[in-house]
From Swiss-Prot:
Domain of life: Bacteria
Lineage: Bacteria, Pseudomonadati, Pseudomonadota, Alphaproteobacteria, Rickettsiales
Reactions that this protein is recorded to catalyse: tRNA(Ile) + L-isoleucine + ATP = L-isoleucyl-tRNA(Ile) + AMP + diphosphate
Gene that produces this protein: ileS
Function: Catalyzes the attachment of isoleucine to tRNA(Ile). As IleRS can inadvertently accommodate and process structurally similar amino acids such as valine, to avoid such errors it has two additional distinct tRNA(Ile)-dependent editing activities. One activity is designated as 'pretransfer' editing and involves the hydrolysis of activated Val-AMP. The other activity is designated 'posttransfer' editing and involves deacylation of mischarged Val-tRNA(Ile).
Matches recorded under Pfam families: Anticodon_1 (PF08264), DUF5915 (PF19302), tRNA-synt_1 (PF00133)
Organism: Rickettsia prowazekii (strain Madrid E)
E.C. code: 6.1.1.5
Keyword tags: Aminoacyl-tRNA synthetase, ATP-binding, Cytoplasm, Ligase, Metal-binding, Nucleotide-binding, Protein biosynthesis, Zinc
Name of this chain's protein: Isoleucine--tRNA ligase
Family membership noted in the UniProt record: Belongs to the class-I aminoacyl-tRNA synthetase family. IleS type 2 subfamily.
Keyword Zinc-finger in annotation: no
Length: 1086
């Protein structure tokens, strides 16, 4: 008679990558992703923003990590009843696209691009930005991330760009924009300024060695200075110096040709150092560093005055380039000058330093900037014209030496900002730009930030909060080509000034009388009109050349993606801010920040309510993943080898989701370990269920009515795990959710299934056996739904299998044009087409038996600790031991499970005691990190008292040295007395077990019998016998086994479904060793 099989034939050794490919086909052919959205029509929505990547490069592990996190919460919120639209987006404008195009076209720089043609250049950018779009879709789909590519928004689309124009005009109307010439970080390689936050992205700072030089400036007012000194000292008229020189130190010698002032600290002490009728002025704290250069012995006494006394003195320019510049070449006191590196005197070049510009402008000194867009000196510095500034340092030093102004050159190692696109060192340079007045509303951003739930939580007030507190005005214009043009037109005649700012295509079309098909340059640049404010009619309104900083466009994503306010106005108002957003932690200076700036300025609301800042992924040695270093595998290769679920678990169960680093090896060993230790145990439970349910022709059902103690326990653990997963994901904590899954399957496999094997294996198909199958089925089905967002493809496979459908069979049906019946979403439905169309399980009708869980967990703890002791003492599990002594206050509960404990750890007797003090003492372990912060001055006394045992447990808490410790400041650990062997603590260090390790001859014989059972079971497996086959057994041994067979023969036969016989032709023969004695084992199927 053929058995009825209710489940697919499931292999224990499965190719998870191949299974995942079948799952992807099933989802695509059956349109599961779209159904997961459609089935939730009418439900409340969960909104998350998909940060737009560039498509001119392949995705890396960082992109995949972010994608995994997005997918987990989108899937989870869907099965929690939310409608979750998932729209992909592309960042298209900006430097990444331009630099790639320059490389491909073989051109470089603004002049070369202009000569090539802006239209042709931008057309190339337009094509190149989507170069890898299909590859992106391949990677994203393979990682099992559900997202809509067909309706993806692009920042280069006309509708998106129009929303950006609207935002700009709104800011303009709110008086939150201004134009100014200010010193900014400047990329001479890209010929564009950068925002201050762009210098904080990723590893923008690099260690760099520069030449730092000290130069002397000759002061003009010799008589005046002599007078200042003589007021403070006994100096006589004949002691007057002929020349005074003030020493300044700089790490940027190339800025010295543009020097216009010097700055000193008001309260800093400055020394007058005499050397050969020349007096050098330097901060007193820096004199020792210049002893050699100034010829000092170290025994000299110097006149000292405060820096404020030097204010107003003038000096001779180092060079004659700007010698007639008004109000220049004077000394000013300022608070930003500090002692430390250098001389305590700072040279001011207002065209190349932000502090320099602010100070000089306050003194009526206009800046000069003799460096062009490519970082080369202009004709204002004729002897350096065309020289790149960094290449000019040595030439300048030589000239200073020739002039007698040079004092010293040093090699100075410091962290210096580099361009995030070209990796070239930045310069600071005055450039004209449009700015958002962030400083005007930064306090409001700080307030709105308190409404956001940040993960990790300390980002709110530290990494992001402090950044907001120190926010500066944001430069949003770039003198580049491929980007949304600033909608600003100016009169070309300063006699008739006028500025027009446009916030829509309609406004532009109305004023210029043309149809706008493309907002990009050069088409938009060609739009001109007569200046309405010019009565002569001769001046013309022309658009300024600049385009938007691409970060402004990224920050406009919430409204730009839906063409707000020109379309979807009601939808946007109802769906803003987003419920969720995720990117890596540096985006606190990037996308998160620009979203916050624009959301606050435009809507006075935070842009999102929950935000995960994940960490970065590095190679196994802690280095950044790099094509050049070849230190990471192509993700697709990893997917094809281990599957993407394994990589998902590896990443999202690690600390990287808490903002820390994740080191991943190139060979994928870490991912393989995840497969082996996390996913395979889940599969093993599924495999066990299907193979034995099919063998017994039994079908499992969702049923929680069994009163079997193991069933009640595992179902209670199931509900606890389901609740924990829900709680964790509600709190945006995948790490804890994955731990809950792993912990549950550890108990399911290594406790419930193992302790229930006799129920599954027995011949009778009674209620107890059916309850076991129902319980295991219920655990698998409920957990499959609960963990479906965490392990989407393996969960789908198991879910389908539990409904007697192999994914391969489904795909065959679909390929033949046969459709699967779609069941409506309903809690009462036993089956939906996909696990991802189910509702999250609540198990509301089942009550957790907490008392049983607590007791059984202690039983499990006792057994696992006992087995660990056996392993440590090299005593195999099949070797029986005489007894275990359990010393606990909860022995009454444990006694109900005495037989289970005896069987599990293989002991004959369990002894219960409660006199713990006779076997162990409690040792106080202090949490130094927490306690040290609260009681730093008492720590030494507390440590000494803890070592001496001078503490007391009171009703108020643990008392020591006159203090009551908080529960998180200490732990009490049971420490068994040294003469007692075979011990372990359990029940949170409140109880002790002692395993009797003495072996008698009787115990040894029984251990041999159990070994023989194991040998026979292994032979059955190798002979490929079915689990139900009965067999003949013959044992041929070098030593006499008759006593063992006489005493334990029935036990051996029962365990192996065998009968002892001789003189038969075996199906399988094996040779094994029992305590160094050879045994030949023969088996034959009956």
């Amino acid at each position: 008679m053929t058995n009825t099989k209710y489940y697919p034939d499931v292999s224990a050794n499965v190719d998870f990558a191949a299974i995942e490919q079948e799952i992807l086909k099933f989802w695509q052919n059956n349109n599961i992703f779209q159904k997961s959205i459609d089935y939730r029509n009418g439900e409340s929505e969960f909104i998350f923003y998909d940060g737009p990547p560039f498509a001119n490069g392949l995705p890396h592990y960082g992109h995949l990590l972010t994608g995994f996190i997005k997918d987990v919460y989108a899937r989870y919120k869907t099965i929690k009843g939310k409608k979750v639209e998932r729209r992909f987006g592309w960042d298209c404008h900006g430097l990444p696209a331009e630099m790639q195009s320059e490389k491909e076209l073989g051109i470089s720089g603004r002049i070369a691009i202009t000569n090539f043609g802006i239209e042709k250049f931008n057309n190339h950018c337009r094509a190149s930005v989507m170069q890898y779009a299909s590859e992106w879709e391949q990677y994203v789909t393979r990682q099992a991330r559900w997202v809509a590519f067909k309706n993806a928004y692009k920042t280069m689309d006309k509708n998106f760009m129009e929303s950006v124009l609207w935002a700009f005009k709104e800011l303009y109307n709110k008086d939150l924009l201004y134009e100014s010439m200010r010193v900014m970080p400047y990329s001479w390689a890209c010929e564009t300024p950068l925002s201050n936050f762009e210098t904080r992205l990723d590893n923008a700072y690099r260690e760099r060695t520069d030449k730092a030089i000290t130069v002397s400036f000759v002061l003009n007012e010799v008589t005046l200075i002599n007078g200042i000194i003589s007021q403070k000292s006994d100096m006589k008229e004949g002691d007057n110096f002929k020349e005074y020189r003030i020493l300044a130190w700089t790490t940027t010698p190339w800025t010295l040709p543009a020097n216009l002032a010097l700055a000193v600290g008001s309260d800093i002490d400055y020394a007058f150092v005499d050397k050969n009728e020349v007096c050098y002025i330097i901060a007193a704290s820096s004199v020792a560093k210049y002893a050699k250069e100034l010829g000092l012995s170290g025994k000299e006494n110097f006149e000292i005055i405060k820096g404020l006394k030097l204010q107003g003195l003038s000096y001779k320019p180092l060079f004659n380039y700007f010698e007639n510049h008004p109000n220049s070449f004077k000394i000013f006191a300022s608070d930003f000058v500090v002692e430390g590196d250098g001389t305590g005197i700072v040279h001011m070049a207002p065209g190349f330093g932000e502090d320099d510009q602010i100070l000089c402008e306050s003194k009526g000194i206009e800046l000069v900037c003799p460096v062009d867009n490519s970082g080369k000196f202009t004709k204002e510095i004729p002897d350096l014209e065309g020289v790149q500034v960094f290449d000019a340092n040595d030439k300048i030093i030589i000239k200073l030496k020739e002039q007698g102004n040079w004092i010293k050159t040093e090699q100075y190692i410091h962290n210096y900002p580099h361009c995030w696109r070209t990796d070239t060192p930045l310069i600071y340079k005055a450039v004209p730009s449009w700015y958002v007045r962030v400083t005007k509303f930064k306090d409001r951003m700080v307030e709105l930030n308190q409404q956001i739930n940040w993960i990790p939580h300390n980002v709110k007030d530290n990494l992001f909060g402090k950044w907001l507190e120190n926010a500066r005005d944001w430069s949003i214009s770039r003198n580049r080509f491929w980007g949304t043009p600033l909608p600003v037109w100016k009169s070309d005649d300063p006699k008739y000034p006028r500025i027009d700012v446009y916030g829509s295509i309609e406004e532009i079309e109305k004023d210029f009388g043309v149809k706008i098909n493309d907002l990009h340059r050069p088409f938009i640049d060609e739009l001109t009109r007569t200046n309405p404010d010019d009565p002569t009619g001769k001046s013309t309104m022309r658009r300024i050349d600049d385009v938007f900083d691409c970060w402004f466009e990224s920050g406009s994503m919430p409204y730009g993606q839906v063409h707000y306010p020109f379309e979807n106005k009601k939808w946007f108002v109802e769906h803003f801010p987003a419920d969720f957003i995720v990117e890596y932690s540096s985006q606190t200076r990037g996308w998160f920040y620009t979203l916050m700036v624009l959301s606050t300025a435009l809507f006075d609301r935070p842009p999102f309510l929950n935000c995960i800042c994940h960490g970065v992924i590095l190679d196994a040695t802690g280095q950044k993943l790099s094509k050049r270093l070849n230190n990471y595998a192509d993700p697709l290769e990893l997917f094809d080898k281990y599957g993407s679920d394994a990589l998902r678990v590896t990443m999202l169960s690690s600390n990287v989701v808490k903002g820390q680093e994740l080191l991943i090896d190139k060979d994928g060993k870490m991912v393989f370990d995840t497969l082996r230790l996390f996913i395979k145990p889940i599969w093993n439970a599924y495999h066990f269920f299907t193979i034995y349910a099919n063998a017994d022709s039994l079908k499992g059902t969702l049923n929680f009515a069994s009163q079997n103690v193991l069933d009640v326990y595992i179902l209670s653990k199931l509900k606890i795990a389901v609740n924990k997963i829900e709680e964790s994901l509600d709190n945006f904590d995948t790490q804890t959710a994955y731990h809950a899954v792993s912990e549950f399957f550890e108990v399911l496999n290594n406790w419930y299934i193992r302790r229930s094997r006799a129920r599954f294996w027995k011949n009778e198909k009674d209620t107890d056996k059916q309850n076991a199958y129902n319980t295991l089925y219920s655990c698998l089905k409920i957990m499959t739904i609960a963990m479906s967002a965490l392990i989407p493809m393996i969960s789908e496979t198991i879910y389908q299998g539990l409904h007697n459908t192999a994914i391969t069979q489904l795909n065959c049906l679909l390929s033949e044009g046969k459709h699967i019946v779609q069941n409506p979403m309903s809690d009462t439905q036993d089956y939906n087409t996909s696990v991802h169309l189910c509702n999250y399980p609540t198990l509301s009708d089942f009550e957790i038996n907490y008392e049983l869980v607590s007791t059984m967990d202690n039983v499990l703890d006792i057994c696992s600790n006992s087995l660990f002791i056996r392993s440590t003492e090299n005593i195999r599990v099949r070797q029986p031991l005489a007894c275990i002594t359990i010393i606990s206050k909860h022995n009454n509960n444990l006694k109900d499970f005495e037989d289970l404990i005896k069987d599990e750890i293989n002991v004959k007797t369990v002894i219960y005691r409660d006199d713990l003090e006779n076997y162990a003492r409690k040792k106080l372990s202090l949490n130094f990190a927490i306690l040290g912060k609260r009681l730093p001055h008492k720590m030494k006394a507390i440590i000494d008292a803890a070592k001496k045992g001078e503490w007391e447990a009171t009703t108020l808490g643990l008392a020591i040295c006159g203090e009551i410790l908080n529960s998180d400041e200490y732990t009490l650990i049971l420490e068994p007395y040294s003469h007692i062997k075979g011990t372990a603590n359990f029940d949170n260090n409140s109880s002790l077990l002692i395993l009797n390790l003495e072996l008698t001859s009787e115990l040894i014989e029984e251990g041999y019998a159990r070994d023989i059972v194991r040998f026979i079971q292994y032979a059955r497996k190798e002979a490929d016998f079915s689990i139900t086959d009965r067999i003949l057994i013959e044992i041929i041994s070098e030593f006499d086994l008759s006593k063992i067979i006489d005493h334990y023969g029935d036990f051996i036969k029962e365990q192996t479904l065998g009968e002892f016989a001789k003189n038969f032709t075996p199906d399988y023969v094996s040779k094994v060793a029992l305590e160094n004695n050879q045994i030949q084992l023969k088996v034959k199927r009956l």
